[in-house]
Amino acid sequence: MFDVIVIGGGHAGVEASAAAARMGKKTLLLTTLIEQIGAASCNPAIGGLAKGHLVKELDAMGGLMGEITDEAGIQFRILNESKGVAVQGSRAQIDMDKYRIIARNKLLKLPNLEISQEQASVLIVENDEVKGVKTNLENIYFAKKVILTTGTFLNGLIHVGENKLQAGRVGELASVNLGNYLQTLGLKMGRLKTGTCPRVDAKSIDFSVLEIQDGDVNPKAFSFRSRNFNPTQLPCYIARTNTTTHEIIKNNFYRAPLFTGQIEGVGPRYCPSIEDKINRFSDKESHHLFIEPQTIDATEYYINGFSTSLPYEVQTQMLRSVKGFENAKITRFGYAIEYDYIEPTELKHTLELKKIKNLYCAGQINGTTGYEEAAAQGFMAGINASLSIDMKEPLILRRDEAYIGVLIDDLVVKGTKEPYRMFTSRAEFRLLLREENAILRLGKYGYDLGLLSEQDFTYIQNIANNLQKGLEFLLSKEFTPNNQNNAFLESLGEDKISSIVNLQKIVARASFDIEKLKKLDPIFETMDHYSLREILNEAKYYHYISMQKAQVEKMKNLSELKIPENFDFKSVSGLSNEVVEKLNHHKPPTIFAASQISGITPAALDILQIYIKMQKKKV
């Protein structure tokens, strides 16, 4: 008898099984190929805009993805560095082979975790409660909780031209039996599609005509726990399609599964295939291609931006029309894959299914796309399954606390009909949710769950104390326009002042940096770089942050008014049938969650608030 069974060893499965095992739960991970645990099925990179936030938040609570990325990374960059700190994003190219090996070894070393190379065929469900799993080897495993992290494997169907192949990804069997079984549980399900790009033999590329894209000179680690971070970095390259490339693709539209009706699933809006780009943006004469090394040996390159399901011979033809790729030899062809997913409105915020007790879902099965989105969900599912076993309150991150909170809330409340990916624009309070303050926002959760060490949490507390002390000093200390103070400002290369201001206003200047902050007062001289950076950020955006915090307080009032789990919305007089129907379907846990449901009017929310408050007074 296991406490937790995790089905699927992708990025969601890695985080789910690790979290559960580290929280003391006897855990079993079932995966089709142990060698493929933590595999990067698509591009060899972790992070990016908003995705980097998810990785940092995982790391802040004790997740694995950040540490693995730092160990396996072969190029590190900060995206949007010229823009505000709220929308900057960390991204790393990874050695995809090394990443898998590190992920697998981390799991194999965990005391409470067993791994078995089997494919789940059927769930054992009694009275709408999951009890265990039956596998393709006829083994039966019982568990208190089961977490589905099946990725693209549920009835996975690969498309290349007119050819179709049942598979979860190239070389691995699709999960047909489990996919068909889930259809019998009365869950709302759909079909989605994603795709991958060709990989090319490095020897066949003429790099001399490509634009070089180097990593950052001073690379920054994803994990705050990474020590002595000094990675060996490789360059990426940029190529461009041309009108010849586009003509080849257009001439083969009739063979594209995307256009022939062969593919029925909905694809990712923000990561279209090259044939979809040429069709939708026919006025464009060129599209960027990012040429990314797959491993530190750089023997094979991933052609990012060239996702396709066109026939093999067409892929070669169109790639060879690109400058630098005239003699390109494709080692692995691109393909599209369709798969089943469960509509995420079927889930609670804990990622447990509403209809099947003790059954949790995380990753692409919930309609998301991306390694980072999957890992974040897997981590939270593993945590909440473990907390539920211990009969403790679940961990549900609010929208103002974390991008992970935004991700899960969007899925559960709004649902999705297309692969969902995270953007900074999805977060209302993104100035509060900066990458670099993730440990300050979420570190205590990780420590309380036993996923962060005493040493890690002490480090976080020291930064928090420095931030509070430094910001209070800047806000309380007045700077008068006398000769001494103005001379000091001029020595820093700053403009003089003509009226009394507090130091926060001076530090808020665009030209004011960390080196100047150190010279401002002895209080800052001994502080570490992390603390100084956060003091600087908080000072520069102080008024905007204050406004967002005021908005958060209003939201908290709604969030703290909880709706009982089995609440009878029909009992509330004054609610329309449409509102009752939507509330019964979504089962929002709070008034704020109810406010996010399309069609729930302010008047309905007022009625509901009054009714719930009256009921609480009666108790």
UniProtKB/Swiss-Prot annotation:
Locations listed in the record: Cytoplasm
Lineage, highest ranks first: Bacteria, Pseudomonadati, Campylobacterota, Epsilonproteobacteria, Campylobacterales
Keywords for the protein's UniProt record, in alphabetical order: Cytoplasm, FAD, Flavoprotein, NAD, tRNA processing
Cofactor: FAD
Keyword Transit peptide: no
Residues annotated to bind FAD: G8, G9, G10, H11, A12, G13
Main location group: cytoplasm
Pfam families: GIDA, GIDA_C_1st, SAM_GIDA_C
SUPFAM superfamilies noted in UniProt: FAD/NAD(P)-binding domain
Oligomer and partners: Homodimer. Heterotetramer of two MnmE and two MnmG subunits.
UniProt-listed GO biological process terms: tRNA methylation; tRNA wobble uridine modification
Gene: mnmG
GO MF entry, a single one: flavin adenine dinucleotide binding
Gene3D superfamilies, alphabetized: FAD/NAD(P)-binding domain (3.50.50.60), GidA associated domain, C-terminal subdomain (1.10.150.570), tRNA uridine 5-carboxymethylaminomethyl modification enzyme MnmG/GidA (1.10.10.1800)
Family: Belongs to the MnmG family.
Cellular component annotations (GO), alphabetically ordered: cytosol
PANTHER family (UniProt xref): GLUCOSE INHIBITED DIVISION PROTEIN A, PROTEIN MTO1 HOMOLOG, MITOCHONDRIAL
Protein name stated in the entry: tRNA uridine 5-carboxymethylaminomethyl modification enzyme MnmG
Protein residues bound to NAD(+): 267-281
Function text: NAD-binding protein involved in the addition of a carboxymethylaminomethyl (cmnm) group at the wobble position (U34) of certain tRNAs, forming tRNA-cmnm(5)s(2)U34.
